Amino acid sequence: MSTEMSTTAGPVREAIERDAIGSRLWFYANYHCNLACAYCLTESAPDVARRVLDPDLMVELADQGRNLGFTSIGVTGGEPFLVPEMPELLGRLSELLPVVVLSNGTLFSGGRLERMRPLGERELRVQISLDRSEAVANDEMRGPENFRKVVEAIPKLVDLGIGVRIASTLAWVDDDDMATLCELHRSLGVPDEDHVVRGVVRRGRALTEGLGEPAGINELGPELTISADGAFWSPFGPTVVAGRVDTDLLVSRAVSPLSRPAEALAGLVTGSGSAGPTDDRFT
């Protein structure tokens, strides 16, 4: 497993401690998904290019990230649990830093659910998307049977001792709808502090569908995000439109050693950095 020299940790650790860049290191595990949500940032669907990030590389970079000063890990996609070894990978990552993994919550049954059992003892939370308190409105944006599968899966994970967060992505919601949604997540074993409500970001498929609010470098906080296509400014950065990955928020094509994109991001925020000769960055 790789480590970083302590001398390279300085500017990145300082930027993290000053809240100049986010303390969570993000990984896009993959881009394919069993759903095709209307507002998806990455145009994910069953038949898209998978763009899987090598699991061993994720562990190596997470170890380097810990030495650089990052304090937690985020794993997103696509649907991360379509990566066959994801439960075991989350175990490896959580040995290094606390982990949150974002999921649509529809794949937790049978053998996969059983493979999640050891993670109940780890610093791991599964953040599951649930947008509405009733099936018709929820499934309109996320797909048939999504609501049923999610409300069945959440208590199963809670029973395993796994921390669950619920993320609701909403273009709008009235007070009554929000109250009903909160009653639902409480009944599933998820407290108010673990309910995240966010707006639709107009990138990816949401841009094509005309949904949400525009978001670029001025609207998105800097959080180092690693994908198979490079390192990005934010987990909202490596979005896909018409099958092509957006590069307006690309920090570096190089992702290893992690100090390279981490220092580039810190430099962009503080105004002290410059791109290397082989870097492909936004301007």
Identify what each model region corresponds to.
Residues 41, 142, 236:
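Short, flexible helix/strand-to-coil boundary loops that buttress conserved ligand/catalytic motifs
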Residues 2-77, 81-95:
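Conserved alpha-helical substructure of the radical SAM core
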Residues 39-41, 101-103, 166:
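Hydrophobic residues in well-ordered beta-strands that form the structural core
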Residues 68-73, 96, 100, 124-127, ...:
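Conserved C-terminal portion of the radical SAM core fold
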Residues 47-60, 80-120, 130-136, 143-149, ...:
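Canonical radical SAM enzyme core domain
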Residues 137-140, 208:
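Short acidic, glycine/proline-rich loop/turn micro-motifs
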Residues 201-283:
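Accessory C-terminal segments flanking Radical SAM cores
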Residues 120-126, 151, 213-223:
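A polyampholytic, Gly/Pro-enriched intrinsically disordered region
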